[in-house]
Amino acid sequence: MSDKIQSRESKTTKPTKTEKISDKSGNLSQVKSSKNLSKSQSIYLEIDSLSKKFLEEGRQYIYKWIRDEYGLSKNEATALDISIYNTTIARMINIYKFDETLAAFLPFKFGKEIISPRQDFYGFATTCGTILYYQSFGDTLGYYNGNWEFNYGNDNRPDYVNDLISEFIHLGGINDISMVNWLASDDTILYLITARVVLEYFFQGDNAEISYFGTRLRQEYLKAKPLIQNRHPGQTTMDSLDIMSNIEWDKLPYNSRAIGAGAAMRSGSIGIFYPGRQNRKKLVALAVECSRITHNSATAILGSVTSALFTAFSLEKISVNLWPHYLLEILRSNIIDEYIEQSRPNEYSLFSRDKVIFQGQWEKYVSSRFSGVNPRDLRYMHNPVERYRYLTENFSKGCDMPGGCGDDCVIMAYDSLLQSNGVLEKVVVYSILHPGDSDTVGSVALSWFGAYYSTKKNLDILSPRFDELEYSNEINNLIWNTEDFVLGLTKVFYKFIYIDIATDLVEQSMKLK
C-alpha cells in the first residue's frame, strides 16, 4: 500500500535565493529556499508565501463578487472589503484555534516560533490530518478482523446490540481497548487511495479536467483489488472492478440495483480539499465520479455526495443540526441534476427517477427527528437497542445489511454524530456497536466526528489507538511526511475558508443596509 500513498515525486530544487513562483493556472506556487534550512524551516517559508498568495486571491474574489453582486462603486467596495477582511481574519483565528498540547500531531515537528504567527492555520491543518486517523479507527474497530462486521454469522436482531456493547467493554472499552494486530477493512484502503488521488487532482490546478480524476481513480482502485479481496469488500465493488478492467473510467453502465455504501465509505476526503459554497459544484462532480467507478446508481451516488459534503460542513463549522437541512436544499436544487445531465445525458432519466428514493429517506428522517432545525429529544433514541430498531425499520428496507446501502449508511452515521454531542464513546456505541454494516457506518461517522470534534480530550483517548492502526504509517506518510498535504491546505484555508466566511459576512452586512 505504501506505493499508493506516496507524494508526488517531482519536488523543487532549492537555490540559495528565496523566490516566489507565480502560477496563473491556479496550481500551488512553491517557494525555493536555501539548502541550509531544515525541512521544517523550508516548509514554513513555503506556507508563509502561499498563505499570502491565496489570501490575496480570496480577497480579490470577494471584492469582485461585491462589485458584481451589489453594484457598489470602487470606493464603497474597497471600504467594505477592508472591513470584511479584518472581521474574517479575526473569525478564522477564533474558530480554528490551535492548542499547543496538540503539537505532536503537527507536520514536520514545527516549533512554537513557527506555529505562533499562524495558529489558526495549524489548528485547521491538524484537524484535517487527523480525519484520516479517525476514519481508519472507526473502520478497524467496526471490522474487528471481520467479526463484528458480520456478527459471527448471527442475525441482525436489534437486541444483539447489547451483546456487542458487552464485548466492547470486555475488550477494554474506549479507554483501554488494544487494536494491535487488528486488520483494516477495504474501507480504509479505498479511503486512503481516494484521498491520495484527490490530492493529486487538487495539485493539477483549478482548471483540471474531471477525466484526470476518473482515470487515476480507476487505475488506483484496480491496483488495490488484490489488497481488498480478502477484507470482505462489497460484491458490487468487486464485480464493477472486474468490468472496469476492460472499459474506460466513465463507461460503467447505470445500475439501479448497485445501491451499496461502497462509495460513501471512501469519498469523504473530497470534502477536506473542497469546502465552501464556491466549491459545491466541484465537490459534487468529484463525489459523483468517485461513486460511478463502482456504484453507478442514484442511491450510491448521492450517498457519496453526502459523505463528502458533510466532511466539508464539518470543516466549515456549520452546526451539525443544520446538515440535513442544507443537504435537502442541495438535493432540491439543480446542482447535482445539472452535473448528471451534462456528464451522462443518457442516464439522467434513470437517475432522476431513482433520486426521489434517497431524497425521500432524508425528508422522512428530518420530519421524524427534527422540530424545525432542532433535533427532537426522543427518549427511545438514548437506548442503543431501540435506536437501532428505529433506524433499521425506517431506513434500511431493501438493504442486505442495515447500514450497507448508500442512503441508510449516511443516515445512521449522521444520527450517531448528532446523538453523540461530541462525546467519543457515544459515537462509537451508536455507529459501530450494532449488527449492521458496522465498519462502514463507523468509518463514515468517525471521519465526520474527527473533522468536527477533534479536541485534545478525544485525541488523548485515541492517539494510542492511532499508533496501533494497520495503516498508521501510510496515513502518516500521506499527511505529514510529505509537503503536499499541508501545502495544499494553505489554499483550502486561506482561499476557500476565507471566501466562505467572508461571503457570509458580506451578506449579513448588506442585509443591514
Swiss-Prot record:
Give a yes or no for keyword Hydrolase in this entry.
yes
- Output the Gene3D superfamilies linked to this UniProt entry: ADP-ribosylation/Crystallin J1
Q: Can the keyword Hydrolase be found in this entry's annotation? A: yes
Which top-rank group of organisms is this from? Viruses
Q: Which UniProt keywords apply?
A: Hydrolase
Q: What is its EC number?
A: 3.2.2.-
Please list the residue ranges that the record marks as compositionally biased, kind Basic and acidic residues. 1-23
Q: Where is the composition biased (Polar residues)?
A: 24-33
Looking up InterPro entries in the UniProt record yields: ADP-ribosylglycohydrolase (IPR050792), Ribosyl_crysJ1 (IPR005502), Ribosyl_crysJ1_sf (IPR036705)
What Pfam families does UniProt report for this protein, alphabetically? ADP_ribosyl_GH
Q: Where is this region: Disordered?
A: 1-33
Any GO MF annotation of the entry: hydrolase activity
Family membership noted in the UniProt record: Belongs to the ADP-ribosylglycohydrolase family.
Q: What is this protein's record name? A: Putative ADP-ribosyl glycohydrolase L444
Question: What organism does the record attribute this protein to?
Answer: Acanthamoeba polyphaga mimivirus (APMV)
